[in-house]
Protein backbone atom coordinates (compact mmCIF):
# COMPACT_ATOMS: atom_id res chain seq x y z
CA UNK A 1 0.00 0.00 0.00
CA UNK A 2 1.30 3.43 -0.93
CA UNK A 3 1.80 5.81 1.97
CA UNK A 4 -0.81 8.53 2.36
CA UNK A 5 0.44 12.07 1.76
CA UNK A 6 0.24 15.22 3.87
CA UNK A 7 0.39 18.25 1.60
CA UNK A 8 0.56 21.87 2.77
CA UNK A 9 -0.96 24.28 0.28
CA UNK A 10 0.50 27.73 -0.29
CA UNK A 11 -1.73 30.21 -2.11
CA UNK A 12 0.48 32.86 -3.71
CA UNK A 13 -0.53 36.39 -4.65
CA UNK A 14 1.80 39.31 -5.37
CA UNK A 15 4.83 37.29 -4.28
CA UNK A 16 3.48 36.33 -0.85
CA UNK A 17 1.56 33.45 0.67
CA UNK A 18 -2.06 34.36 1.45
CA UNK A 19 -5.10 32.53 2.81
CA UNK A 20 -8.80 33.21 2.52
CA UNK A 21 -12.07 31.66 3.63
CA UNK A 22 -14.21 30.04 0.91
CA UNK A 23 -11.80 31.58 -1.63
CA UNK A 24 -12.48 35.15 -0.41
CA UNK A 25 -11.05 37.81 1.91
CA UNK A 26 -7.41 36.74 1.70
CA UNK A 27 -4.94 37.75 4.39
CA UNK A 28 -1.15 37.75 4.07
CA UNK A 29 0.53 34.79 5.77
CA UNK A 30 4.19 35.34 4.95
CA UNK A 31 7.04 34.87 2.49
CA UNK A 32 7.03 31.91 0.13
CA UNK A 33 10.51 30.41 0.48
CA UNK A 34 10.80 30.37 4.31
CA UNK A 35 7.36 28.77 4.61
CA UNK A 36 8.22 26.13 2.04
CA UNK A 37 11.45 25.34 3.88
CA UNK A 38 9.64 25.09 7.21
CA UNK A 39 7.05 22.65 5.91
CA UNK A 40 9.67 20.46 4.28
CA UNK A 41 11.62 20.33 7.54
CA UNK A 42 8.46 19.48 9.51
CA UNK A 43 7.91 16.39 7.38
CA UNK A 44 5.52 17.38 4.59
CA UNK A 45 5.39 14.81 1.81
CA UNK A 46 4.80 17.35 -0.91
CA UNK A 47 3.93 21.03 -1.37
CA UNK A 48 1.39 22.65 -3.66
CA UNK A 49 1.68 26.28 -4.77
CA UNK A 50 -1.26 28.10 -6.32
CA UNK A 51 -0.70 31.49 -7.94
CA UNK A 52 -4.35 32.25 -7.30
CA UNK A 53 -4.85 35.23 -9.62
CA UNK A 54 -2.75 34.05 -12.57
CA UNK A 55 -5.64 32.58 -14.57
CA UNK A 56 -8.07 35.39 -13.85
CA UNK A 57 -5.35 37.95 -14.66
CA UNK A 58 -4.60 36.17 -17.93
CA UNK A 59 -0.93 35.46 -17.14
CA UNK A 60 1.23 32.47 -16.32
CA UNK A 61 2.40 31.90 -12.76
CA UNK A 62 5.12 34.30 -11.60
CA UNK A 63 8.18 32.08 -11.96
CA UNK A 64 10.74 34.05 -9.97
CA UNK A 65 10.14 32.13 -6.75
CA UNK A 66 9.86 28.62 -8.25
CA UNK A 67 13.61 28.10 -8.66
CA UNK A 68 14.27 29.53 -5.19
CA UNK A 69 11.88 27.00 -3.67
CA UNK A 70 13.58 24.18 -5.59
CA UNK A 71 16.91 25.20 -4.07
CA UNK A 72 15.77 24.93 -0.44
CA UNK A 73 13.50 21.87 -0.30
CA UNK A 74 14.10 18.21 -1.09
CA UNK A 75 10.50 17.04 -1.42
CA UNK A 76 8.30 17.12 -4.54
CA UNK A 77 6.29 20.24 -5.26
CA UNK A 78 3.52 21.15 -7.64
CA UNK A 79 2.87 24.58 -9.17
CA UNK A 80 -0.40 25.95 -10.55
CA UNK A 81 -1.51 29.22 -12.01
CA UNK A 82 -2.43 30.25 -15.54
CA UNK A 83 -0.58 27.41 -17.29
CA UNK A 84 -2.24 27.45 -20.72
CA UNK A 85 0.34 25.87 -23.04
CA UNK A 86 3.09 23.28 -23.34
CA UNK A 87 5.60 26.13 -23.25
CA UNK A 88 4.21 27.47 -19.97
CA UNK A 89 4.44 24.03 -18.40
CA UNK A 90 7.94 23.38 -19.72
CA UNK A 91 9.19 26.60 -18.12
CA UNK A 92 7.71 25.76 -14.72
CA UNK A 93 9.17 22.25 -14.80
CA UNK A 94 12.55 23.56 -15.94
CA UNK A 95 12.67 25.81 -12.88
CA UNK A 96 12.46 22.75 -10.66
CA UNK A 97 8.78 21.93 -10.11
CA UNK A 98 7.99 18.21 -10.12
CA UNK A 99 4.36 18.58 -11.20
CA UNK A 100 2.16 21.19 -12.76
CA UNK A 101 -1.51 21.64 -11.99
CA UNK A 102 -4.16 23.10 -14.25
CA UNK A 103 -7.66 24.18 -13.32
CA UNK A 104 -9.38 27.08 -15.10
CA UNK A 105 -7.29 26.63 -18.29
CA UNK A 106 -8.42 22.99 -18.48
CA UNK A 107 -12.05 24.10 -18.32
CA UNK A 108 -11.42 26.63 -21.07
CA UNK A 109 -9.65 24.04 -23.26
CA UNK A 110 -9.95 20.40 -22.11
CA UNK A 111 -7.56 19.26 -24.87
CA UNK A 112 -4.79 20.94 -22.87
CA UNK A 113 -4.88 18.04 -20.40
CA UNK A 114 -4.13 15.49 -23.12
CA UNK A 115 -1.44 17.59 -24.77
CA UNK A 116 0.36 18.08 -21.45
CA UNK A 117 0.07 14.40 -20.54
CA UNK A 118 1.41 13.33 -23.94
CA UNK A 119 4.35 15.72 -23.69
CA UNK A 120 5.38 15.38 -20.04
CA UNK A 121 3.73 12.16 -18.84
CA UNK A 122 0.59 11.69 -16.79
CA UNK A 123 2.63 11.40 -13.59
CA UNK A 124 3.25 15.14 -13.48
CA UNK A 125 -0.13 16.42 -14.69
CA UNK A 126 -2.54 17.33 -11.90
CA UNK A 127 -6.02 18.71 -12.46
CA UNK A 128 -7.45 20.92 -9.74
CA UNK A 129 -11.22 21.03 -9.44
CA UNK A 130 -12.95 23.83 -7.53
CA UNK A 131 -16.29 22.34 -6.54
CA UNK A 132 -19.22 24.09 -4.87
CA UNK A 133 -22.18 22.33 -3.26
CA UNK A 134 -25.51 23.93 -4.12
CA UNK A 135 -27.80 23.19 -1.18
CA UNK A 136 -30.91 24.14 -3.17
CA UNK A 137 -30.32 21.59 -5.92
CA UNK A 138 -28.24 19.08 -3.98
CA UNK A 139 -25.67 19.11 -6.79
CA UNK A 140 -21.93 19.75 -6.94
CA UNK A 141 -20.82 22.21 -9.61
CA UNK A 142 -17.36 23.06 -10.93
CA UNK A 143 -16.31 26.71 -10.64
CA UNK A 144 -13.79 28.63 -12.76
CA UNK A 145 -11.51 31.64 -12.14
CA UNK A 146 -11.92 31.28 -8.38
CA UNK A 147 -8.80 33.33 -7.64
CA UNK A 148 -10.74 36.53 -8.38
CA UNK A 149 -14.07 36.97 -6.59
CA UNK A 150 -15.35 39.30 -9.31
CA UNK A 151 -14.68 36.77 -12.09
CA UNK A 152 -15.57 33.49 -10.39
CA UNK A 153 -18.27 31.68 -12.32
CA UNK A 154 -20.16 28.41 -12.17
CA UNK A 155 -19.47 26.24 -15.23
CA UNK A 156 -21.83 23.84 -16.97
CA UNK A 157 -19.92 20.89 -15.49
CA UNK A 158 -21.20 18.90 -12.57
CA UNK A 159 -18.28 17.75 -10.46
CA UNK A 160 -18.58 13.99 -10.96
CA UNK A 161 -18.86 14.39 -14.74
CA UNK A 162 -15.77 16.61 -14.85
CA UNK A 163 -13.81 14.14 -12.69
CA UNK A 164 -14.54 11.42 -15.23
CA UNK A 165 -13.77 13.70 -18.18
CA UNK A 166 -10.34 14.82 -16.97
CA UNK A 167 -9.31 11.22 -16.32
CA UNK A 168 -10.23 10.26 -19.88
CA UNK A 169 -8.10 13.14 -21.11
CA UNK A 170 -4.98 12.14 -19.18
CA UNK A 171 -5.05 13.62 -15.69
CA UNK A 172 -2.60 11.72 -13.50
CA UNK A 173 -3.97 13.10 -10.23
CA UNK A 174 -6.95 15.13 -9.06
CA UNK A 175 -7.07 17.72 -6.29
CA UNK A 176 -10.65 18.27 -5.17
CA UNK A 177 -10.95 21.79 -3.74
CA UNK A 178 -14.22 21.81 -1.79
CA UNK A 179 -15.07 25.50 -1.77
CA UNK A 180 -17.81 25.35 0.87
CA UNK A 181 -15.30 23.98 3.37
CA UNK A 182 -12.32 26.14 2.41
CA UNK A 183 -10.73 27.85 5.41
CA UNK A 184 -13.65 26.96 7.69
CA UNK A 185 -11.75 24.18 9.51
CA UNK A 186 -14.83 22.08 10.28
CA UNK A 187 -13.79 18.99 8.35
CA UNK A 188 -13.53 17.72 4.79
CA UNK A 189 -16.77 17.08 2.88
CA UNK A 190 -16.66 13.30 3.30
CA UNK A 191 -19.94 12.75 1.47
CA UNK A 192 -18.60 14.47 -1.63
CA UNK A 193 -15.21 12.78 -1.36
CA UNK A 194 -16.83 9.35 -1.23
CA UNK A 195 -18.89 10.11 -4.34
CA UNK A 196 -15.79 11.30 -6.20
CA UNK A 197 -13.72 8.35 -4.99
CA UNK A 198 -16.19 5.97 -6.64
CA UNK A 199 -15.46 7.43 -10.09
CA UNK A 200 -11.85 8.53 -9.56
CA UNK A 201 -9.27 5.92 -10.50
CA UNK A 202 -6.18 8.12 -10.22
CA UNK A 203 -4.71 9.52 -6.99
CA UNK A 204 -7.26 11.76 -5.27
CA UNK A 205 -6.26 14.62 -2.97
CA UNK A 206 -8.78 16.14 -0.55
CA UNK A 207 -8.63 19.91 -0.10
CA UNK A 208 -10.73 22.23 2.02
CA UNK A 209 -11.88 21.95 5.61
CA UNK A 210 -9.13 20.44 7.74
CA UNK A 211 -9.24 21.78 11.29
CA UNK A 212 -8.14 18.89 13.50
CA UNK A 213 -6.01 15.78 13.24
CA UNK A 214 -9.21 13.73 13.27
CA UNK A 215 -10.32 15.42 10.06
CA UNK A 216 -7.25 14.07 8.27
CA UNK A 217 -7.92 10.60 9.68
CA UNK A 218 -11.53 10.69 8.48
CA UNK A 219 -10.48 11.63 4.95
CA UNK A 220 -8.01 8.75 4.76
CA UNK A 221 -10.10 6.16 6.59
CA UNK A 222 -13.62 6.96 5.42
CA UNK A 223 -13.09 8.39 1.92
CA UNK A 224 -9.89 6.51 1.00
CA UNK A 225 -8.17 9.58 -0.42
CA UNK A 226 -4.49 9.33 -1.35
CA UNK A 227 -3.49 12.66 0.12
CA UNK A 228 -4.87 15.43 2.29
CA UNK A 229 -4.10 19.04 1.47
CA UNK A 230 -4.47 21.82 4.01
CA UNK A 231 -3.41 25.41 4.56
CA UNK A 232 -4.92 27.25 7.52
CA UNK A 233 -4.04 24.66 10.17
CA UNK A 234 -0.40 24.63 9.05
CA UNK A 235 -0.02 28.36 8.41
CA UNK A 236 -1.43 29.23 11.82
CA UNK A 237 0.53 26.41 13.49
CA UNK A 238 -2.64 24.82 14.85
CA UNK A 239 -1.29 21.44 13.73
CA UNK A 240 2.36 20.37 13.50
CA UNK A 241 2.99 18.06 10.55
CA UNK A 242 5.28 15.72 12.48
CA UNK A 243 2.77 15.34 15.30
CA UNK A 244 -0.04 14.82 12.79
CA UNK A 245 1.83 12.00 11.08
CA UNK A 246 2.66 10.34 14.39
CA UNK A 247 -1.05 10.47 15.31
CA UNK A 248 -2.12 9.01 11.96
CA UNK A 249 0.40 6.19 12.34
CA UNK A 250 -1.09 5.25 15.74
CA UNK A 251 -4.49 5.08 14.02
CA UNK A 252 -3.24 2.58 11.47
CA UNK A 253 -2.78 4.95 8.53
CA UNK A 254 0.15 4.07 6.27
CA UNK A 255 2.22 7.25 6.45
CA UNK A 256 5.85 8.26 5.95
CA UNK A 257 7.42 9.12 9.30
CA UNK A 258 10.50 11.34 9.18
Swiss-Prot record:
Q: Which GO terms describe its molecular function?
A: imidazoleglycerol-phosphate synthase activity; lyase activity
| Pfam families on file | His_biosynth
What is one GO cellular-component annotation here? cytoplasm
User: What biological process terms from GO does the record include?
Assistant: L-histidine biosynthetic process
Known InterPro entries for this protein?
Aldolase_TIM, His_biosynth, HisF, IGPS_HisA/HisF, RibuloseP-bd_barrel
Reaction catalyzed? 5-[(5-phospho-1-deoxy-D-ribulos-1-ylimino)methylamino]-1-(5-phospho-beta-D-ribosyl)imidazole-4-carboxamide + L-glutamine = D-erythro-1-(imidazol-4-yl)glycerol 3-phosphate + 5-amino-1-(5-phospho-beta-D-ribosyl)imidazole-4-carboxamide + L-glutamate + H(+)
- According to its UniProt record, which residues of this chain constitute the active site? 11, 130
Q: Please state the pathway this protein functions in, per its UniProt record.
A: Amino-acid biosynthesis; L-histidine biosynthesis; L-histidine from 5-phospho-alpha-D-ribose 1-diphosphate: step 5/9
Q: Where in the cell is it found?
A: Cytoplasm
EC number(s) per UniProt?
A: 4.3.2.10
Query: What are the entry keywords?
Result: Amino-acid biosynthesis, Cytoplasm, Histidine biosynthesis, Lyase
The record's HAMAP family line, in alphabetical order, gives: HisF
Describe the function of this protein. Answer: IGPS catalyzes the conversion of PRFAR and glutamine to IGP, AICAR and glutamate. The HisF subunit catalyzes the cyclization activity that produces IGP and AICAR from PRFAR using the ammonia provided by the HisH subunit.
Kindly state the subunit structure of this protein. Answer: Heterodimer of HisH and HisF.
User: What does the similarity note say?
Assistant: Belongs to the HisA/HisF family.
The protein's name is: Imidazole glycerol phosphate synthase subunit HisF
Organism whose genome encodes this protein? Shigella flexneri
Coding gene?
hisF
Amino acid sequence: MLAKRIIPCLDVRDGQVVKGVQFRNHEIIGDIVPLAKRYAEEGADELVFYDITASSDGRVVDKSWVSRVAEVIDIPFCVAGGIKSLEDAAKILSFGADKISINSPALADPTLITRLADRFGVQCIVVGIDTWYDAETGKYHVNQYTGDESRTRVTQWETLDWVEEVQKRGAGEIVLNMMNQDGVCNGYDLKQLKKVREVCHVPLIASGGAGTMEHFLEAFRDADVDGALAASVFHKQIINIGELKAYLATQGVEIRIC
